[in-house]
Amino acid sequence: MTDLPDSTRWQLWIVAFGFFMQSLDTTIVNTALPSMAQSLGESPLHMHMVIVSYVLTVAVMLPASGWLADKVGVRNIFFTAIVLFTLGSLFCALSGTLNELLLARALQGVGGAMMVPVGRLTVMKIVPREQYMAAMTFVTLPGQVGPLLGPALGGLLVEYASWHWIFLINIPVGIIGAIATLLLMPNYTMQTWRFDLSGFLLLAVGMAVLTLALDGSKGTGLSPLAIAGLVAVGVVALVLYLLHARNNNRALFSLKLFRTRTFSLGLAGSFAGRIGSGMLPFMTPVFLQIGLGFSPFHAGLMMIPMVLGSMGMKRIVVQVVNRFGYRRVLVATTLGLSLVTLLFMTTALLGWYYVLPFVLFLQGMVNSTRFSSMNTLTLKDLPDNLASSGNSLLSMIMQLSMSIGVTIAGLLLGLFGSQHVSVDSGTTQTVFMYTWLSMALIIALPAFIFARVPNDTHQNVAISRRKRSAQ
């Protein structure tokens, strides 16, 4: 990339900065949830909605981001994304109630949904094709650093300042990023097709109301009748989308995608798999603080080995899949993650705290292997004309399943805790023990889906090579 013009390098820095903001925000909040609950006068059992409101909004808005960038221009949409994200951060810091915080997090989610996909699109437009891989490696590196710094930085700010600062630090950074975007980034546009607004609204309504219904009376305080109504609305919306997309060449996501068996299995496995693994980044710091009495900063530091294990495993995951095949790797890592989850709970409750960093490092390795294998399996056999649509659907499903996972984790805590989780409660560790046992079972269930994946090692070799050349 040394031969790129200075203006292009600055534009890549802006995109990298956006990736960092978005990735940092996905992890920095987790460590602060118990302190937020105390400050807002809420039960810690309700605080999972702070994460769900953000991730669910990202899932809902993702399908529209690429079309908006092509229609309005990448600079205008990227600038809007940074502004919305920064305003959402300000409103989060100013929130005096949980409901205000949830609305502000949803605003943040709108910005976050546009930031990363539009950033990728920007790189495609400003960098020559032969340098695309190097450019994407450069801009995504800060996105990998964000999860590494987020938990510890969040714990540090909570312990020595207040939880408000995990949002306030975004404001000066966001202002600088917005100004740099206006001054330095070109506003590329493309000829667009007619956006499938009907399909978008049906999917958005279906995803949102079903997630809210899942949270149920434990989180949102809804009556059984209201929950039943939400379920009915959500199911009807999704059925209407299926009818709408059938034989519709302009549908948001074509049903032709599901004619590819590996895509169907991979998407189903990714959805179910990320529900289980999506619980872990939320539950781990909460358990360390409320269940074991760790300080916010200590709990944040404990998350670093998990991120390091995940980053380190990415270098050899292709060789692992080539050697053993998708089916064996996915079944083994799914069951392995369930066992590591049980190991974490056991060592924590036994008081073997010095072992926890090693267990979390192992958890990161197993999870990373499974994620990479799921992603590649899902997309590897799609025809070229469906690859972009399949990738967008996978990205949406990833966010949706993580929001559902966090929702279920909060539901389990509420179910076993009966609203009595606190540091002084003698039943706290028992509540967490039952929750972690349930999580381990949920994490293991996708193994039944992955067991149906064809196990063709030679095919995996060819696909892995193609994957590496495309990155």
From Swiss-Prot:
Biological source species: Shigella boydii serotype 4 (strain Sb227)
Sequence intervals crossing the membrane: 12-32, 49-69, 77-97, 102-124, 138-158, 165-185, 197-217, 225-245, 263-283, 286-306, 342-362, 396-416, 431-451
Keywords from the named record: Cell inner membrane, Cell membrane, Membrane, Transmembrane, Transmembrane helix, Transport
Ranges in the topological domain labelled Cytoplasmic: 33-48, 98-101, 159-164, 218-224, 284-285, 363-395, 452-471
Subcellular location: Cell inner membrane
Name under which the protein is recorded: Putative multidrug resistance protein MdtD
Subcellular location, principal: membrane
Family: Belongs to the major facilitator superfamily. TCR/Tet family.
Domain of life per record: Bacteria
Membrane topology classification: Multi-pass membrane protein
